[in-house]
Amino acid sequence: MNKGKLYLIPVPIHNEEEFNSKFIPPYLTEEINKLNVFAVENIRTSRRFLRKINPKFKINDTTFHLIDKRTEEAEYSNIINCLINGNDVGVMSESGCPGIADPGQKLCSLAHHKNILIKPLIGPSSILLALMSSGLNGQKFTFHGYLPIEKEKRIKAIKKLHPNTGSHIFIETPYRNQKVYDDLIQNLKPDIRKLCIATDLTGINESIFTKKISELKQSNIILKKYPTIFIFE
C-alpha cells in the first residue's frame, strides 16, 4: 500500500471577516478539494475557511485532527497512522503557513521519520512578506519567534542581538505590540539600527514602514492591536 502525502496548506493571514479569494491560488483550492482529512490548529476556523473557498465542501464527510500545544502524542500517532494507511492529510495553521512557529512543525518531523512525502503548497507567509518589503537584509536573517513576555528578559534578548548579524525577525501577540515596540525603541542603538514594523499584512489596515531608531524616537507611534511582524538590523 502506498503511503499518503502530507499537504502543508497556507491560509489567509488577515482578519477572517476580510476574506478575499484573490489571496488563494486556484491550484490551492483544487488540492484542498481532494482532501477529506485535516490536521489543524483550530477546527472551527478551519471549517469556516474550507466553506469560504468552496461553499459545497463536504464538511460532514471530513475528519479533523486538532494539533495545538496541548495535543498528546497519541493524536500525532493517529495522524501518522492515517498517512501510513494511504490517506492524504492537509495541515492548516490558524493563520499563514503551517510548520513555522506552529504545531505543524512536529507533525512534519514525524512524517519525515516515517518517510512520508511532504508537499508544501504556495501561499501567504507574513514573515516573508514583511522581510521582502522591509528593505532590510534579505540575504542573512534569523526568525526568533516571540520575544520573552517578561520585560527584563525581553530587554536582555533585544540587547543580545548584534547589529552585524543580519535581520532579526519577531512576531508578537497583538495586545503586546506597544510594549515590544517601546522596548525596541528604548534599547536599540539609535544611530546604527533600523526597525521595520509590518502590521495586518494583506488586510485592509495593512501598514509597513522601516525607519532608523533615531527617527522613530522623534515620533509618537501608537500601534494598533493587529498581527505584527517586527524586523530590525
Give residue ranges: language-model regions.
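Glycine-rich, flexible N-terminal cofactor/catalytic loop recognition
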Residues: 1-67
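A contiguous loop/helix-start segment that scaffolds small-molecule binding in enzyme catalytic cores
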Residues: 2-7, 84-88, 166-233
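Class I SAM-dependent methyltransferase SAM-binding "motif I" and its flanking Rossmann-like core
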Residues: 7, 106-164
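Short glycine-rich anion-binding loops that position phosphate/pyrophosphate groups of nucleotides
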Residues: 13-16, 94-98, 174-176, 201-203
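Short active-site oxyanion
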Residues: 32-38, 115-119, 167-168
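Acidic beta-strand-to-loop metal/phosphate-binding motif
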Residues: 39-40, 90-96, 168-172
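Conserved helicase motor
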Residues: 65-72, 146-150
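A glycine-rich beta-strand to alpha-helix segment
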Residues: 82-132, 176-180
